[in-house]
C-alpha cells in the first residue's frame, strides 16, 4: 500500500537539514533522468525572482506555450513549487516521480530536499510535454541545484543585494558573481539595473566573459497594462524584465498580455480587503515595500517574523517608518532557522523597541494584531518571511 501523502512528505522534509550547496550530487543524478531538452528561462537575484518567474509563466502561457514553473519555497503546500500551465503538480504525481527517481538514481540517498524537488520538477516537465520551463534559483546560482541545466538558455538576474552573506559573500561583487554563476555559453542574459551604472557594466562584462551571447538591461519602451493599485514599482520593474526576456528569446510576434489578472502569491497581495501579505525579508526588499506602503496605504499595523540570519535591526527600523504597532511571532517552532520573539526583541533598535507587541501564544498575537488593525481602521501587513505569511494563512485557514 502506498504511504499517505503526509507521511511521504515527512520523509522528504527530513532531508532538509540546512542548506547544502554544491553541484556534485545533483550533477551525477541529472544526466541519469534527463531525456528531453526543454528551452529554459533561469531566474536568479536577491529579490524579485518570484515576480519575474510568475510573469514569464503568464507571458508564455498567454502566447499558447505549455509551461513548467519551478519556485521555492512554498507557502502552504509542497505542490506549489512545481506547476504546469499554472496547475500545481498532483500528490500522486509527486509520489510517482519520487519512486521513479529512487529506483533510477544510484546516489539518491545523498540528495537533499531541494535537489530531489528540482529533479521531480524537471521530470514532470518532460512527462507533461512542456514547451518552455521557468526555473527560480533557490539560493545564489553558481552552486544551486538548478545550475546543472545546460545552455543555451535565457538568464535573468533581477537584483543584487546583501542577503545570505554568510554563504554568498559579504560584498555586492561577491554576491553578483554567485548569481552570474548561472550564465552558460551562448546564453541570453538580462540584468535588472541598479543605481550604479558602473556596477551594471561590470556585471555585463562578467556575463560576456562567461560566453554569453548577449547581455541587456531592463529598459523597455513599450506600454504594459498594469493593475492600477496592485503592483509596487519594484514589481513592475521585474515584470518588465520578464517581458524583455520573452521578447529577446521568442519568435517575432510575441504578444504582451494584460497583467491585471496575474496573481503573484504574497507579493503585496491583498488576501482580504484589509490584509496584505508580502514575503519581503531583507533590507532592500523591506525598503521597497515600505515605500509602496507609504504611498498606497499610509500607516499600517504589522505582523512580523524573521529568520535568525536576517538583518532584523535594519529591517525593523524600516518597518518602523510605516507603523506604530509591530506584532511579533515566533518562527523557531516552525523552522530551525526561525527567530524567537526574544531574538527579535534583543535586536530591535531604540527607534522601534517601544512599538513591538506580542502575546503568550502566536495565535493570540495574530488575533490581537488583526483585531487592533480593524478597530483602528488600518490595514494589517503580514511580512518578514515566507514562514510569517505561511503561519498567518494557516491560522486564518486559507488554502
Where are these regions (language model features)?
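Short functional linear segments
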Residues: 1-45, 52-54, 58-65, 70, ...
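ATP-dependent carboxylate-amine ligase catalytic core
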Residues: 23-36, 62-150, 168
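Short Gly/Thr/Asp-enriched flexible loops that form oxyanion-binding sites at enzyme active sites
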Residues: 56, 142-153, 393-396
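Hydrophobic alpha-helical packing residues
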Residues: 56-61, 125, 319, 348
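Nucleotide phosphate-binding/pyrophosphate-handling subdomain across enzymes
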Residues: 127, 132-135, 144-156, 160-161, ...
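Conserved catalytic-core segment of NTP-binding enzymes
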Residues: 142-143, 150-210, 312
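C-terminal helical cap/extension that packs against the catalytic core
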Residues: 194-219, 316-379
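Active-site-proximal loop/hinge segments that shape catalytic or ion-binding/gating pockets
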Residues: 385
Amino acid at each position: 500500500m502506498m504511504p499517505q501523502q503526509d507521511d511521504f512528505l515527512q520523509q522528504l522534509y527530513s532531508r532538509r537539514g540546512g542548506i547544502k550547496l554544491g553541484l556534485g550530487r545533483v550533477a551525477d543524478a541529472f544526466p541519469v533522468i534527463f531525456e528531453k531538452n526543454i528551452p529554459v528561462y533561469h531566474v536568479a537575484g536577491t529579490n524579485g525572482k518570484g515576480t519575474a518567474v510568475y510573469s514569464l509563466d503568464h507571458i508564455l502561457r498567454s502566447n499558447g506555450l505549455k509551461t513548467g514553473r519551478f519556485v521555492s519555497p512554498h507557502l502552504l503546500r509542497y505542490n506549489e513549487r512545481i506547476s504546469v500551465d499554472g496547475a500545481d503538480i498532483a500528490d500522486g504525481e509527486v509520489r510517482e516521480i519520487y519512486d521513479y527517481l529512487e529506483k533510477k538514481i544510484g546516489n539518491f540517498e545523498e540528495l537533499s530536499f531541494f535537489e530531489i524537488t528540482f529533479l521531480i520538477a524537471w521530470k514532470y516537465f518532460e512527462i507533461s510535454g512542456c514547451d518552455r520551463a521557468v526555473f527560480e534559483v533557490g539560493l545564489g546560482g553558481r552552486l544551486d541545484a538548478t545550475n546543472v541545466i545546460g545552455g543555451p538558455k535565457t538568464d535573468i538576474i533581477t537584483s543584487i543585494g546583501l542577503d545570505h552573506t554568510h554563504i554568498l559573500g559579504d560584498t555586492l561583487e561577491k554576491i553578483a558573481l554567485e548569481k552570474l554563476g548561472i550564465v552558460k555559453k551562448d546564453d541570453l542574459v538580462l540584468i535588472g539595473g541598479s543605481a550604479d551604472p558602473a556596477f551594471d557594466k561590470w556585471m555585463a562584462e562578467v556575463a560576456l566573459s562567461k560566453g554569453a551571447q548577449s547581455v541587456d538591461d531592463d529598459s523597455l519602451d513599450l506600454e504594459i497594462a498594469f493593475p492600477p493599485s496592485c503592483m509596487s514599482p519594484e514589481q513592475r520593474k521585474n515584470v518588465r524584465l520578464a517581458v524583455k526576456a520573452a521578447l529577446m528569446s521568442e519568435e517575432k510576434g510575441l504578444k504582451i498580455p494584460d497583467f491585471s489578472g496575474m496573481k503573484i502569491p504574497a507579493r503585496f497581495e491583498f488576501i482580504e480587503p484589509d490584509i496584505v501579505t508580502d514575503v519581503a525579508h531583507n533590507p532592500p526588499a523591506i525598503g521597497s515595500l515600505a515605500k509602496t506602503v507609504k504611498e498606497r496605504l499610509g500607516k499600517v499595523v504589522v505582523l512580523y517574523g524573521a529568520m535568525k540570519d536576517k538583518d532584523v535591526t535594519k529591517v525593523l527600523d524600516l518597518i518602523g517608518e510605516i507603523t506604530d504597532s509591530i506584532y511579533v511571532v515566533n518562527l523557531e517552532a516552525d523552522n530551525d532557522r526561525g527567530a524567537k520573539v526574544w531574538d527579535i526583541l534583543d535586536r530591535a533598535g531604540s527607534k522601534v523597541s517601544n512599538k513591538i507587541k506580542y502575546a503568550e501564544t502566536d495565535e493570540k498575537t495574530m488575533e490581537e494584531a488583526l483585531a487592533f488593525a480593524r478597530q483602528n481602521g488600518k490595514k494589517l501587513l503580514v511580512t518578514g518571511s515566507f514562514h510569517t505569511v505561511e503561519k498567518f494563512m494557516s491560522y486564518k485557514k486559507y488554502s
